């Protein structure tokens, strides 16, 4: 505002000089008569100004009298409105949280009113008729929506008038500087002067007002009785009032008519009672700032008319407020300006001169040409406008008539003109005309002349109406506010009335359209009725035969005979009708039979496939039988056999050679492998396969072979060969049709096509014909033989009759002849057989070719997907496996998991998820899951949301899927497909999110970093794109451009086969270039560049794939150029921007961020959860060496790291120190190694450690109490007094105050109340190794006893059963014999016992029952009783003996793992006659890596079982790991087990052992079962190094270092393998969300190095014996 005002003043001055120049120049050219007329006009103007001043004085006197009456009603109205406001706050407070402030409604109202969005939202909501719902459990953003929705509902029902005006912001708006009123007073006093100097002073005072009145202070009462203030710009205040006036009008119309679109009429609302409205109603304030003009009423007559309806006033109110306003007989503020046109112009100019505060606000002008004397009364709020506060609030333009118009000189006129030009920024006027009831906005130009005497109110109204009608297109301005409220300098602005006109016009159009629609509907209904009627008529006609007698003319014969031709015609028509009906019935029957056949074919598809396989086996058997017969032929017929075998070999060679590199030759005569290369097929995502045609080269080879074989065959078999050739050509023609076969079900079994059935029928017919021909030939041969025999017999009889004497001689000859004839017959039969065999062989060869082709087609149909390097036998075995019931169950469960993955829900139990290992190792189930998962992700990928709560569940499922895939023996198509689909699920909201997850998977599994595996994925993507674009053109590319899928085929030979054909087909297809560029650049270059591959490999791979993309030459060149440029950019950026192998493109992902310290990338999906922090885990917990160096440099630097000037040193500064510590605490901190700067730098961490130390020591003290009580009861309470003193000292607590003081200046103390932890002597589990560190600890005294807080922390969830349910009634003293003490647990001591009946050793744990520990005991017994696992200690029974419980467990002979881990003790032998003590060398008995892997594996199995039952052990350490003679490893001591229920998935109680506890447990944060994983990592470090990390430090110092720095590195990392170090680092991850669970760790490669149980048992026995021998040599001298 302050910047704009000088410019406006300068513009005003320049315009005023122009006006003066324009006025003076015509005076020289005017005639004397015209000059006299001008002087007369000036005199008249002066007289009118004097009259106006007199009227203003009278009005001021009347207003002063009215103000006294108004104050009575203001308080009542304000109190009423405040009650309404409180009710609104209560209503919203119930829906929202209690954290809302008292003034949230006012703030939201002020912000929305200032921006002008309320009116827009209201109009849109009234148009649409929708209001958003209220959120019952809102967050911060939803809370704001609740407030806005409630306000919108108030505006919609006309209730906002109850709310706007009681607001404390709007009622208490005051001017920031009170000096402005004084300046205005000085201006009014100087107005009556006639000198030019006084006029100049007036202008200066007005300019001062411009600079000071730019802001207003808004005050609101507070709860405590104070006042909240807020400064508001006057521009916003003005917008607020304009919005209020417009919304009040709308609300009143909604209240009266139900819609603001209807205009109010005189009959709709009764006018209020008339009140005399004299000149006393003027609000011109010359000497008093409390009375201001709110409305400027310009009239051409002397009287003013009242508005016909209350809605035309600038501020409308609801009925409740109108009732109160009618009772209050108050007058409306009005002004009278009874002057001519010139006087009106001068008055406007002078008003603008004194209202420079409102330079950027519109003016309200009410013009009424008719004359009436009554005005409606306004409510008390409107009368309150007379106050000074509401004056500065409302910003409705004021008409101060304290002007400089009394001057008679020309200079005064010039000054008036100057004032005119100074205030040309008053651009907008809202004019309300009473007679027409129209509201319009008139744009006042900056260069208009105010001396136009011919302008009238009628012309103004007509002009404004024309402008409003013409400009109705744009409703909103550039800044988003409505043009009604905007103050832009556009002369074509739209008025509010024109806006309503347009809405009414649209409403009329909509009503007309509705009428036309209804009429059209009626016509449609009538037409439908007519159609139904006609249909019924046609049915009747069809049902009844047509009688043509009525339509045929009869003859003139008196007998009535009909001609024969006509009778025949009628009969034919009747026959045609019957035939048509029969045809209809036959068609229906055929359709039913076809459906029935299709269903039967689908059901019997498996049987048909089996029949085909059996037929092929029969053919093989026949061929083998024929080969055996051919091998047994004689040597004379070898040539014909060799010819047939040659044909067979040639056919086999052609079948084996046609397959290219991927074919496999068979040893037998008939090859069952797929000889042809796999066709160019679609991806699995399209759920169909395209059958490829046979190559023309192969066809020619087969035809040549058949022609060669035909030359050796006889003539009578030529027909069969021709039939075979015809059948083969029909197969080729059928395969060339590119017919697609869709999958009928998830099992991938298809129905047999009609072509195959026809081929089978043809083959059967050919076989039948051949058999018939063979039978006929055999019959003919037999007949010939019979005839020959008969002829011979006749000849013999004749010879016998004639030559009886020569019989003996001839008999010998005859016998010889008969032998010769028999030999000839045999030879003829053999020749016939050979010919038949040749025919059969040739037929079998043609049949083999046909069968091979049929097998290829059937394999393409039967196999739902082509698997790389897989034969038909594998496919058949998979189909047989899929038929079993076990696979069906597994597939159903896989579908259930798929639905859980997609919907991100928790309806799958965690115990069932472990079945996935069996599912995904099976290839058939993996294939079915992949198909279902792809179909579901296509449909629901963008619709279903991803919850943050269920994100971990989906990640867990995906991790198990990937781990199972990684462990699978073969890397097939479906395993890679599952990786892509799971990454798509995790990143469903992102377009290119799949690449990110693949990069992470390849980092974790480097064996998959091979381009050969992924080459076919990318090639399949190109095929999919090619088929999409070639089928639908470039129009479909826009729809598929957003999703980038990287799928793949399986065999590399497919790419080589298709590249040969790509050159021929590249010119036939037009592919969208941009779509392929996106897929190549994003999914190829960016993905492969981050795998750590070389630049040349990525470049060659992408260019080779781009050449196979079916592009034209020009587009291919462009594509290769872009690929090379992106490769160059991605690899050059690694040296400058990127840290590591990642490319610069990764910055485009939202989840990926960069650490502020080490400048490494933080991955969003690393297998666990997404992180949005800008600090990596190592820098957060200061585990990086670089971070530690930076931290040390920052803490010990001489000067702070700030901007210039550098090296600033403060001689006097404020220091921090801890005061008020007792001596025990000081000694504890000193012994723990804490220094002052560490405490100052890490105050919260120190407090967390001290709290944890106190709670842990309290727990230890309670256990020591139980142990001492048990020992005292067994030893007859010998040391009761000492125990009581120890208990009194241990139960005392100290309330510590850390006073942070200013050492030298302020001496202010900040009290931090904290309960000091008490220090116990037995707080370390490694007292044998650390006696020097722990013996000097002191227990400080504690004056107060406040155990309630820590008792609540130690509480375990209340069990649902009692102790009686767990304890048996037998007497344990009779059953067991108690022996020596073995050790102690968390709740009591452990003894060795023996069963008196069986003699079996058991472990007996005696626990004292008390009110404090009964819950812990019940929890321990119940968990042990319900836990049955090989790695969990076995529960036998439990008994109650007085106030003790005996817990009987199995006995582990080698005890705990602690005794076997640490170094051998330095044994010192003491005898009576020996010398002084001599130290022996230490003998180290560390476990090797295989033994550590075995222990970790066994412990993880037990932990996994416990975690599956939703429980956490919380005390995993070497003391609680027991060992048996058979090498068994079992978890014991369930005293601190916590149940994780659905209501309480995390815990925050402090339990466990300090050195084995996780950082989140030490800090007091919530934790879950991941705490046990941390303890396992510490156990692994203890097994490798002999002691846990920080064991040499005191407990407090160790806890402090664990929370800050984590676990240190290995002492000797070269001694251990990388798998072991990785395993330990995973367990000891500081971020519990990134820490894996037990099920994931069981699949780690380190555990595969575990030894056998026998080897571990031998090692344990060796260590046990050595330690036993060492202890046996010890002799004690007392």
UniProtKB/Swiss-Prot annotation:
Q: Where is the composition biased (Polar residues)?
A: 17-34, 215-224
* Cofactor(s), by name: Mg(2+)
Record's keyword terms, sorted: ATP-binding, Coiled coil, Kinase, Magnesium, Metal-binding, Nucleotide-binding, Serine/threonine-protein kinase, Transferase, Zinc, Zinc-finger
Zinc fingers (Phorbol-ester/DAG-type), renumbered ranges:
1141-1197
As recorded in UniProt, its EC number(s) are 2.7.11.1
User: What gene codes for this chain?
Assistant: pakD
Instruction: Report which reactions are catalysed by this protein.
Output: L-seryl-[protein] + ATP = O-phospho-L-seryl-[protein] + ADP + H(+); L-threonyl-[protein] + ATP = O-phospho-L-threonyl-[protein] + ADP + H(+)
Is the keyword Protease in the record? no
**Domain CRIB stretches:** 1202-1215
Q: What is this protein called?
A: Serine/threonine-protein kinase pakD
Q: Where is the composition biased (Acidic residues)?
A: 460-472
Query: Which family does the similarity line name?
Result: Belongs to the protein kinase superfamily. STE Ser/Thr protein kinase family. STE20 subfamily.
Q: Which domain of life is it from?
A: Eukaryota
Q: Name one GO cellular component term.
A: cell trailing edge
Enzyme class per UniProt? transferase
Q: Which residues form the active site?
A: 1515 (proton acceptor)
The cross-references to Pfam families, in alphabetical order and at most eight, read: C1_1 (PF00130), PBD (PF00786), Pkinase (PF00069)
Question: Taxonomically, what lineage is the organism?
Answer: Eukaryota, Amoebozoa, Evosea, Eumycetozoa, Dictyostelia
Give the compositionally biased regions (Low complexity).
Answer: 1-15, 35-73, 180-214, 276-359, 399-428, 631-654, 662-671, 695-713
């Amino acid at each position: 505002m302050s910047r704009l005002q000088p410019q406006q003043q300068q513009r005003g001055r320049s315009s005023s000089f122009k006006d003066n120049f324009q006025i003076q120049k015509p005076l020289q050219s005017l005639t004397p008569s015209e000059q006299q007329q001008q002087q007369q006009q000036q005199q008249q103007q002066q007289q009118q100004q004097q009259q106006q001043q007199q009227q203003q004085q009278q009005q001021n006197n009347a207003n002063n009298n009215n103000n006294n009456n108004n104050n009575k009603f203001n308080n009542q109205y304000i109190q009423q409105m405040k009650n309404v406001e409180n009710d609104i706050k209560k209503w919203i407070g119930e829906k929202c949280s209690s954290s809302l402030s008292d003034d949230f409604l006012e703030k939201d109202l002020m912000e929305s009113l200032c921006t002008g969005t309320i009116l827009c939202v209201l109009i849109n909501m009234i148009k649409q008729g929708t209001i958003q719902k209220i959120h019952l459990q809102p967050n911060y953003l939803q809370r704001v929506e609740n407030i806005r929705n409630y306000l919108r509902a108030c505006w919609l029902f006309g209730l906002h008038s109850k709310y706007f005006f009681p607001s404390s912001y709007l009622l208490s708006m005051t001017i920031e500087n009170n000096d402005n009123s004084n300046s205005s007073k000085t201006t009014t006093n100087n107005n009556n002067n006639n000198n030019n100097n006084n006029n100049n002073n007036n202008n200066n005072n007005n300019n001062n007002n411009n600079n000071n009145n730019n802001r207003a202070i808004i005050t609101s009462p507070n709860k405590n009785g104070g006042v909240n203030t807020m400064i508001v710009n006057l521009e916003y205040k003005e917008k607020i009032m304009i919005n209020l006036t417009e919304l009040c009008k709308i609300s009143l119309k909604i209240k009266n008519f139900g819609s603001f679109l209807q205009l109010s009429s005189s009959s709709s609302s009764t006018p209020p009672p008339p009140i005399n409205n004299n000149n006393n109603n003027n609000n011109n304030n010359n000497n008093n700032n409390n009375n201001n003009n709110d409305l400027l009423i310009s009239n051409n007559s002397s009287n003013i008319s009242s508005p016909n309806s209350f809605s035309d006033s600038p501020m409308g109110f609801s009925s409740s407020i109108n009732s109160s306003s009618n009772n209050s007989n108050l007058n409306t503020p009005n002004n009278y300006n009874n002057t001519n046109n010139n006087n009106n112009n001068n008055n406007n100019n002078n008003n603008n001169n004194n209202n420079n505060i409102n330079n950027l606000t519109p003016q309200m002008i009410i013009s009424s040409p008719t004359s009436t004397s009554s005005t409606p009364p306004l409510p008390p709020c409107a009368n309150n406008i007379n106050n000074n506060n509401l004056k500065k609030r409302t910003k409705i333009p004021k008409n101060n008539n304290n002007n400089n118009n009394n001057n008679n000189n020309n200079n005064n006129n010039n000054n008036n003109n100057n004032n005119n030009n100074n205030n040309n920024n008053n651009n907008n006027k809202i004019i309300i005309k009473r007679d027409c009831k129209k509201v319009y906005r008139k744009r006042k130009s900056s260069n208009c002349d105010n001396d136009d005497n011919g302008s009238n109110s009628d012309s103004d109204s007509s002009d404004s109406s024309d402008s409003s009608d013409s400009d109705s297109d744009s409703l909103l301005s550039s800044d988003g506010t409505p043009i009604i409220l905007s103050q832009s300098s556009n002369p074509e602005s739209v008025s509010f009335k024109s806006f309503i006109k347009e809405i009414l016009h649209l409403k009329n159009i909509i009503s007309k359209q509705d009428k036309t629609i209804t009429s059209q509907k009626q016509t449609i209904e009538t037409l439908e009725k007519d159609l139904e009627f006609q249909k019924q008529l046609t049915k009747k006609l069809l049902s009844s035969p047509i009688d043509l007698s009525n339509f045929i003319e009869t003859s003139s014969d008196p007998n009535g005979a009909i001609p024969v031709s006509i009778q025949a015609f009628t009969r034919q028509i009747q026959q045609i009708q019957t035939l048509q009906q029969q045809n209809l019935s036959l068609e229906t029957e055929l359709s039913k039979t076809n459906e029935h056949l299709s269903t039967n074919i689908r059901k019997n598809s498996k049987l048909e496939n089996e029949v085909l396989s059996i037929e092929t086996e029969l053919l093989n058997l026949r061929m083998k039988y024929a080969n055996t017969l051919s091998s047994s032929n004689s040597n004379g017929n070898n040539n014909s056999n060799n010819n047939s075998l040659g044909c067979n070999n040639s056919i086999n060679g052609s079948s084996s050679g046609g397959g290219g590199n991927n074919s496999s030759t068979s040893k037998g005569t008939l090859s069952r492998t797929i000889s042809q290369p796999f066709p160019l097929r679609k991806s699995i995502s399209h759920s169909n396969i395209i059958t490829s045609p046979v190559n023309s080269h192969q066809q020619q080879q087969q035809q040549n072979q058949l022609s060669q074989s035909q030359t050796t065959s006889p003539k009578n078999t030529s027909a069969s060969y021709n039939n075979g050739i015809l059948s083969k050509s029909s197969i080729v023609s059928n395969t060339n049709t590119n017919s697609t076969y869709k999958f009928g079900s998830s099992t991938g079994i298809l129905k047999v096509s009609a072509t195959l059935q026809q081929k089978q029928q043809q083959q059967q017919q050919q076989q039948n014909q051949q058999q018939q021909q063979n039978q006929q030939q055999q019959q003919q041969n037999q007949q010939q033989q019979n005839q020959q025999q008969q002829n011979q017999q006749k000849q013999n009889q004749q010879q016998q009759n004639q030559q009886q004497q020569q019989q003996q001689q001839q008999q010998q000859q005859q016998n010889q002849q008969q032998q010769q004839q028999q030999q000839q017959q045999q030879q003829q039969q053999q020749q016939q057989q050979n010919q038949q065999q040749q025919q059969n062989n040739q037929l079998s060869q043609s049949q083999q070719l046909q069968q091979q082709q049929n097998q290829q087609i059937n394999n393409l149909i039967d196999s739902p997907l082509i698997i790389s390097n897989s034969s038909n036998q594998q496919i058949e075995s998979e189909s047989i496996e899929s038929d079993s019931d076990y696979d069906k169950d597994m597939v159903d469960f896989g579908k259930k998991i798929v639905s859980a993955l997609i919907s991100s829900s928790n309806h799958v139990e965690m115990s069932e998820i472990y079945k996935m290992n069996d599912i995904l190792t099976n290839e058939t189930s993996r294939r079915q899951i992949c198909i279902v998962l792809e179909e579901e992700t296509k449909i629901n990928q963008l619709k279903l949301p991803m919850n943050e709560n269920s994100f971990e569940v989906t990640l867990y499922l995906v991790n198990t899927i990937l781990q199972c895939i990684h462990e699978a023996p073969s890397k097939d198509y479906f395993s890679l497909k599952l990786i892509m689909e799971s990454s798509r699920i995790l990143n469903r909201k992102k377009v290119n999110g799949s690449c990110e997850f693949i990069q992470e998977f390849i980092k974790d599994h480097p064996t998959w970093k091979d381009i050969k595996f992924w080459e076919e994925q990318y090639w399949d993507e190109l095929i999919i794109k090619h088929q999409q674009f070639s089928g639908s053109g470039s129009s479909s590319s826009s729809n598929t451009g957003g999703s980038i899928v990287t799928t793949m085929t399986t065999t590399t030979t497919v790419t080589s086969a298709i590249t040969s054909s790509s050159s021929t087909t590249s010119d036939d297809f037009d592919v969208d270039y941009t779509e392929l560029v996106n897929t190549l650049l994003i999914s190829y270059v960016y993905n492969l560049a981050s795998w750590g591959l070389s630049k040349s490999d990525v470049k060659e791979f992408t260019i080779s794939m781009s050449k196979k993309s079916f592009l034209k030459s020009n587009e291919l060149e462009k594509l290769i150029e872009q690929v090379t440029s992106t490769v160059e950019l991605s690899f050059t950026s690694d040296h400058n921007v990127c840290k590591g192998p990642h490319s610069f493109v990764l910055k485009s992902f939202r989840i990926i961020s960069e650490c502020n310290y080490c400048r490494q990338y933080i991955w969003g999906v690393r297998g666990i959860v997404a992180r949005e922090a800008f600090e990596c885990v190592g820098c957060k917990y200061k585990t990086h060496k670089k971070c530690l160096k930076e931290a040390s440099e920052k803490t010990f630097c001489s000067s702070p790291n700030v901007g210039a000037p550098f090296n600033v040193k403060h001689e006097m500064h404020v220091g921090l120190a801890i005061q008020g510590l007792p001596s025990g605490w000081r000694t504890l901190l000193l012994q723990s190694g804490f220094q002052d700067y560490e405490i100052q730098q890490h105050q919260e961490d120190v407090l967390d450690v001290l709290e944890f130390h106190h709670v842990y020591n309290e727990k230890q003290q309670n256990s020591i109490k139980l142990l001492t009580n048990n020992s005292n009861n067994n030893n007859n309470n010998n040391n009761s007094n000492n125990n009581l003193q120890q208990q009194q000292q241990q139960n005392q607590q100290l309330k510590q105050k850390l006073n942070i003081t200013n050492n030298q200046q302020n001496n202010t103390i900040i009290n931090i109340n904290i309960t000091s932890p008490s220090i116990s002597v037995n707080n370390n589990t490694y007292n044998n190794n650390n006696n020097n560190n722990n013996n000097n600890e002191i227990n400080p005294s504690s004056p107060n006893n406040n155990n309630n807080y820590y008792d609540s922390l130690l509480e375990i969830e209340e069990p649902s059963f009692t102790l009686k349910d767990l304890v048996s009634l037998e007497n344990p003293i009779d059953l067991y014999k108690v022996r020596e003490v073995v050790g102690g647990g968390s709740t009591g001591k452990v003894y060795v016992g023996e069963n008196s009946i069986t003699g079996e050793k058991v472990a007996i744990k005696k626990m004292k029952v008390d009110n404090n520990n009964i819950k812990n005991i019940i929890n321990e017994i119940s968990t042990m009783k319900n836990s049955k696992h090989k790695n969990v200690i076995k529960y036998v029974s439990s008994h109650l003996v007085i106030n003790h419980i005996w817990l009987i467990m199995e006995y582990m002979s080698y005890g705990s793992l602690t005794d076997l881990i640490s170094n051998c003790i330095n044994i010192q032998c003491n005898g009576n006659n020996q010398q002084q003590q001599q130290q022996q060398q230490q003998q180290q008995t560390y476990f090797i890596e295989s033994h550590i892997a075995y222990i970790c594996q066994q412990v993880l199995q037990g932990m996994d079982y416990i975690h599956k039952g939703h429980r956490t052990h919380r005390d995993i350490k070497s003391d609680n790991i027991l060992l048996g003679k058979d090498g068994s490893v079992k978890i014991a001591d369930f005293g601190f087990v916590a149940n994780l229920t659905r209501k309480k998935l995390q815990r925050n109680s402090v339990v466990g052992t300090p050195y084995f506890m996780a950082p989140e447990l030490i800090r007091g944060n919530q934790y879950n079962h991941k705490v046990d994983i941390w303890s396992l990592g510490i156990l692994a470090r203890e097994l490798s190094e002999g002691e846990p990390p920080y064991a040499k430090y005191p407990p407090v110092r160790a806890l402090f270092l664990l929370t800050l720095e984590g676990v240190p590195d290995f002492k000797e990392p070269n001694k251990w393998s990388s798998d072991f170090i990785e395993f330990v680092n995973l367990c000891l991850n500081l971020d519990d969300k990134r820490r894996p669970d037990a099920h994931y760790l069981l699949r780690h490669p380190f555990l595969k190095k575990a030894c056998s149980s026998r080897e571990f048992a031998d090692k344990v026995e060796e260590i046990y014996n050595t330690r036993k021998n060492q202890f046996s040599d010890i002799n004690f001298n007392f």
